[in-house]
């Protein structure tokens, strides 16, 4: 059980004009690197995203379920579900599955009237955060976030801070590495930075 939870560093940052989510791309089982190309940040809807640290299969299963639920919500209500409502829905799903849980720690981020970020544990516990981190490198990432975060941070600055947090975790945590996935969610919607953009920012 503990083996499934090893590996990964994910980071979330609320900015004045959006939210940033970032994660490394390594998947590991125990001390073995299973993949160097795993995506751990996902688009759920136009202005909604999820990042997960833990069992890749469980994360993907939850993502598929949430995408189906938000499509159903759109069909019934005629608009996108709010970030808070998606966090509540995810919390209910996780709590309902607590005896056969989704093995992971999840970050829900999005933009409706304002940017918002929630962290959820596998039992459905939910916390709204200005910034957070999850996974094996979270302590290293938190140190960077706590040092660099400010209330009026913008998305451009948030992107750089998130990359710095993942980069530091990659240097010190053997279960974190092999590149970075980074997305922003703003009033304009969900956007994933490409590899060239990330490499340029890391220089």
Swiss-Prot record:
Residues annotated as the enzyme's active site: 8 (nucleophile)
Query: EC number(s) in its UniProt entry?
Result: 3.4.25.1
What reaction is this protein's catalytic activity?
Cleavage of peptide bonds with very broad specificity
What's in the keyword line of the UniProt record? Autocatalytic cleavage, Cytoplasm, Hydrolase, Protease, Proteasome, Threonine protease, Zymogen
Q: Which residues form the propeptide?
A: 1-7
Q: Which Pfam families match?
A: Proteasome
**Which Gene Ontology MF annotations are present?**
threonine-type endopeptidase activity
GO cellular component terms, alphabetically, are: cytoplasm; proteasome core complex, beta-subunit complex
Compartmental location = Cytoplasm
> What controls how active this protein is?
The formation of the proteasomal ATPase PAN-20S proteasome complex, via the docking of the C-termini of PAN into the intersubunit pockets in the alpha-rings, triggers opening of the gate for substrate entry. Interconversion between the open-gate and close-gate conformations leads to a dynamic regulation of the 20S proteasome proteolysis activity.
Tell me how this protein assembles: The 20S proteasome core is composed of 14 alpha and 14 beta subunits that assemble into four stacked heptameric rings, resulting in a barrel-shaped structure. The two inner rings, each composed of seven catalytic beta subunits, are sandwiched by two outer rings, each composed of seven alpha subunits. The catalytic chamber with the active sites is on the inside of the barrel. Has a gated structure, the ends of the cylinder being occluded by the N-termini of the alpha-subunits. Is capped at one or both ends by the proteasome regulatory ATPase, PAN.
Family classification: Belongs to the peptidase T1B family.
Q: Can you say what this protein is called? A: Proteasome subunit beta 1
Q: Which organism is it from?
A: Thermococcus onnurineus (strain NA1)
């Amino acid at each position: 059980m503990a083996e499934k939870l090893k590996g990964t560093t994910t980071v979330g940052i609320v900015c004045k004009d959006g939210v940033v989510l970032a994660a490394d791309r390594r998947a590991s089982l125990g001390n073995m690197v299973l993949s160097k190309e795993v995506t751990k940040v996902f688009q759920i809807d136009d202005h909604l995203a999820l990042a997960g640290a833990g069992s890749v299969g469980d994360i993907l299963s939850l993502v598929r379920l949430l995408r189906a639920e938000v499509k159903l919500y759109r069909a019934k209500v005629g608009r996108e579900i709010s970030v808070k409502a998606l966090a509540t829905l995810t919390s209910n799903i996780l709590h309902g599955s607590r005896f056969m849980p989704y093995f992971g720690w999840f970050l829900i981020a999005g933009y409706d009237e304002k940017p918002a970020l929630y962290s959820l544990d596998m039992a459905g516990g939910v916390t709204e955060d200005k910034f957070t981190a999850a996974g094996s490198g979270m302590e290293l990432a938190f140190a960077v976030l706590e040092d660099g975060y400010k209330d009026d941070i913008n998305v451009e600055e948030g992107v750089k801070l998130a990359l710095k947090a993942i980069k530091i975790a990659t240097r010190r945590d053997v279960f974190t590495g092999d590149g970075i996935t980074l997305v922003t969610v703003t009033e304009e919607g969900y956007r994933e930075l490409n590899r060239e953009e990330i490499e340029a920012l890391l220089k």
